[in-house]
């Protein structure tokens, strides 16, 4: 599956900005309302780590593809 530049940028923003903010929010609310947030924040963090890894592989493959195309042009 290929992502457009816009899709990649949105996914990267979600993984690097939105998810950490959501984890902080959930953790803070858990402290205020005295409920355990370990399972949910751990799950979200694991999913974000997986998504970040997939995005990293996607980015690396894109870079290799671009380099190959640039070498063909030269």
From Swiss-Prot:
A biological-process GO annotation: killing of cells of another organism
Disulphide-bridged cysteine pairs: none
Transmembrane segments: 15-35, 37-57
Membrane topology annotation: Multi-pass membrane protein
Keywords annotated in UniProt: Cytolysis, Host cell inner membrane, Host cell lysis by virus, Host cell membrane, Host membrane, Membrane, Transmembrane, Transmembrane helix, Viral release from host cell
Keyword set includes Transmembrane helix: yes
Cellular component GO terms held in the UniProt record: host cell plasma membrane; membrane
Name of the molecule in the record: Holin
Encoding gene (name): dph
């Amino acid at each position: 599956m290929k992502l457009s530049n816009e899709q990649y940028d949105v996914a990267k923003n979600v993984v690097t900005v939105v998810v950490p903010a959501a984890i902080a929010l959930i953790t803070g609310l858990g402290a205020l309302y005295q409920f355990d947030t370990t399972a949910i924040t751990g799950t979200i963090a694991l999913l974000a780590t997986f998504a970040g890894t997939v995005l990293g592989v996607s980015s690396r493959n894109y870079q290799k593809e671009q380099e190959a195309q640039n070498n063909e042009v030269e």
